[in-house]
Structure formats: C-alpha cells, structure tokens
C-alpha cells in the first residue's frame, strides 16, 4: 500500500514559501513519537483575528492542539477591542505530518460535527482522540482562500521569485 513510515500533507491553498517551514515540522516530528503534527505561528498586529479565513489554534502546555477554529480563539473576554494579543493568538498553518498508522486511521474516520461546522478536517482527528502535536515556526505561508486572494498571491510569488533570482545571482558572482 504505502511504502513510507510518515507522510507529509501539503494543502493546495496553503503554500510554504520557505523550505525551513517544512523543516520546522519534519525534524521535531521524527524525534517526538507524535502520531500527527502541524505548525502554528504567532499572530501579530497585521493579522486579522476576526477573519474566518485565518484558522487559529489553541494548544496545551505541552504543545498539543486543544482546538482549531475560524473564530477568534482564545477570546479575551475583558478586551472589547478584540485585537491580537502577542503570544496568546496563533495562526494554524495548513501543513500536516502523520505516521502511516494514523493516516490510515484518519482516512477511515467519518466527518464529525465539529469538522462539519468549521470545515476543518483536523477537527476530525481531535474528535476521534488523535493527539495533534503543534510546533511553532516563524515562517509564514501563502494562503489562497478566495478568488480575491489570487492577485495578492501572484504578487507575493513574483516577489519571492525575484528574491530567489537575486540570491542566486549573488552566490554565482565571483568574490573579489
């Protein structure tokens, strides 16, 4: 069936622009004994906490997911501004890694009520008792959630390609 022992799932609407983002997931997973893993990054003031297109994650003290949501979680009850609180709010990045056994179990699971409500497949794992380990990265990914995101994504990809060319030219230039 599958030859590998662990499997990486890259979502088509979430593009990692830096290979280090994947290293931030793969390296700790291979050393952790976790059955499923994913990434988060700290939200900052430029991130829209209220945007349902940005999935948020809340973790326990050991780094396991408590919940994923399109809602602004955790909600700071006494803050009427509903702004991002540094170190408290995290964006979930849509990349996953599974052990072979967990991926096979996950594929056989039925959609649960939480997954159906939020339209987030990782909630199926939580609803079925799979512990999802979440590691932090400083790298952002490129999200494309709606047709209106495409022009901005195209511009970011052009900037990324331009930077890559510039870095490659600088490496190729002879040193004096």
Which residues does each PLM region occupy?
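Conserved alpha/beta core of the MobA/IspD/sugar-nucleotide pyrophosphorylase nucleotidyltransferase superfamily
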Residues: 84-170
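Short beta-strand-to-loop acidic/aromatic patch adjacent to the donor-nucleotide binding site
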Residues: 2-15
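Electropositive, surface-exposed helix/loop patches at the edges of structured domains
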Residues: 20, 25, 165-176
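Short beta-strands and strand-loop turn motifs
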Residues: 7-10, 37-40, 106, 133-137
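Conserved core of the sugar-phosphate nucleotidyltransferase
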Residues: 17-109
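A short, conserved beta-strand element in the Rossmann-like catalytic core
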Residues: 15-16, 141
